[in-house]
A protein has these predicted regions:
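Conserved glycine-rich beta-strand-loop-beta hairpin in the small C-terminal domain of fold type I
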Residues: 24, 28, 43-53, 65-78, ...
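Preference for bulky hydrophobic residues occupying beta-strand positions
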Residues: 56, 76, 116-118
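A short linear hydrophobic-aromatic micro-motif
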Residues: 53, 61-65, 99-104
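Residue-level recognition of strand-loop junctions within catalytic nucleotide-signaling folds
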Residues: 1, 32, 77-79, 119-121
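PLP-dependent enzyme catalytic core of the Aspartate aminotransferase-like
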Residues: 82-87, 91-100, 106-140
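Short, cationic motifs built from Arg/Lys/His that form the positively charged side of catalytic pockets
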Residues: 12, 48-49, 115, 131
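Conserved core segment of the aminotransferase class I/II
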Residues: 1-46, 53-55, 136
Length: 140
């Protein structure tokens, strides 16, 4: 119904397109003080990325190039599973409760990969890959 669609659109616009004032102030502070803020953030995300890569490479049928290069995203090779990236992403979400994007969301060349953001604490990354490692076709 149209009235519900209008309300949902308004909520979506406010959530997606309008950053809360607290977030705007935090972003402004980070930009104004980037010399003191940035190095610690870069190191934190680098540590998480290397930690996640090590966790991934211990799981059969999953692989990430080492050492990882780039930002806090990893592209995980899952071709040895014999499943599509959408199938693996859906199973991981359903069975391990870990969200990853199927590689084909980035085009045909992304098929056979999953994209993971290393933006959570290392303990969360470790738990996520422990759960994934217990799943068939990875660990069972």
């Amino acid at each position: 119904p149209q009235p519900i669609i209008r309300v949902v659109q308004q909520i979506n616009e406010n959530v997606v397109f309008t950053a809360p004032s607290m977030s705007q102030r935090a972003a402004l502070y980070a930009l104004q003080h980037r010399e003191e803020v940035q190095p610690a953030l870069v190191e934190t995300f680098r540590e998480r990325m290397f930690f996640a890569a090590a966790c991934i490479n211990r799981i059969p049928k999953m692989h990430v190039s080492y050492p990882p290069k780039g930002s806090f995203y990893l592209f995980i090779n899952i071709k040895k599973t014999g499943l599509t990236s959408e199938e693996v992403a859906a199973r991981i979400l359903q069975e391990a409760h870990v969200l990853m994007l199927p590689g084909n969301a980035f085009g045909a060349c992304g098929e056979g990969y999953l994209r993971m953001a290393c933006t959570v604490d290392k303990a969360v990354i470790e738990e996520a890959f422990a759960r994934i490692g217990r799943m068939a076709p990875f660990g069972k």
